[in-house]
Amino acid sequence: SNVGMLGFSLMALEKFYCYDKKNKLNEKEIKAFIKSKNKKKIVFGFTSKVWAFFNDSNFLKKQINFNGITLVHGGGWKKMKDSEVSKKYFDETLKKKYNFLNILNYYGLVEQTGSIFFQCKLHRHFHTTIFSDIIIRDKNFISVNKKKGIVQLISLLPFSYPGHNILTQDVGEIIG
């Protein structure tokens, strides 16, 4: 969503867009991004779009090194189900092929923009923030820890629309 991109871009000193208005690779922008003097660089995108971008035949012909750059991606895993790309394969392939410093995955919903749950490197679990929480429900009640159920997201951030409390279709569990 444009709102998600806007939110992440607020932290940027410079912004570069890898696609032009006709949805074609913008090689000039990509090269400018790589050559930028900023020390900390982040590539942001939605998971399925990131995968499509880095596997685009036109892009694969380029030998672009993202050494020292962090990739932040989230959402789009349901769209990736048909391609049978696992999270582990996604990370390993992009690190090996493009030399990313870090690859950070997050969980979030466009319906609750601003609430994102980053996956830790150590255990690959998603974590809440001080502004949000997750409740796991079975079909009737709040589920106990370590039992799978439907994910309900709670957030302090949305106040201009009723997005502070959303029951999703996703299945999850609280580990600790």
Stretches found by the model and what they are:
Residues 2-176:
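Active-site glycine/GP-rich loop and adjacent strand/helix microenvironment
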